[in-house]
C-alpha cells in the first residue's frame, strides 16, 4: 500500500503517519528524514545535500528525486510506505510517477488533509517548546500546568520564530500557491482522497482507514 500525505503546515500529517505505520506495518518517509539520512551516510549524494542545506538553500528537484528513488527502493518499502513532504510541486509529482514506474510500483492513495488557514494559525501559533528538554505544548489543546513552564523539567517555554502568526500565514499562502496544483494533478488521476483535517486525531485516523479499506 503506497500512499502520499498532502496538507498544509500544521495539518498533522506526521502525527497521523506515526499512528498509521504501527497499524499497517509500513515505513513513514519524510523528505526531512531522507535528507538527514543522506547526509549521515557520507555518500556523494549526501555530501551535495549537506553543502546545500548549510547554505540554507532548497535542495533542487533532481537531487530530491534521486534521494526519494533510493529510499523507496529499500527493502522496508516492499509492502508499502507513507510519503510525507513530497511531492510539493507538479514537476515533483510527475517525477514520482516516473520513480514508481521504474520501481514497478503504483501509487495507491493520495490523502489530502484539508485544514483552513485560521485552523492552521490556531494550531501552530499556539505551539510552545521547552527550551531545556524539547517537549512540545499547545496553549489550547495541550497547555502546560504552569504558564510558561515545562511540566517535565520546569524549563522555560518559547515560541519558534516560524511559529509566529504572520510567518504561519505566509507559510500557508506559499503552500497553497505551490502545492495546491499537486492536489489538482492527483484529482485528475482519481487517486486523491480528501479528509477533514480539522477533526480530532482519532476521527481522522478512522477516515483514512475507511478510505484504504474500501
Swiss-Prot record:
Q: What is its main location?
A: cytoplasm
Tell me its EC number(s), please. 2.7.4.3
Alphabetically sorted, this entry's keywords are: ATP-binding, Cytoplasm, Kinase, Metal-binding, Nucleotide biosynthesis, Nucleotide-binding, Transferase, Zinc
Location in or out of the cell: Cytoplasm
MF terms per GO, please? adenylate kinase activity; ATP binding; zinc ion binding
List every stretch annotated NMP. Answer: 30-59
A Pfam family found in this protein is: ADK
The record's subunit annotation is: Monomer.
* Protein name stated in the entry: Adenylate kinase
Species in which this protein is naturally found: Thermosipho africanus (strain TCF52B)
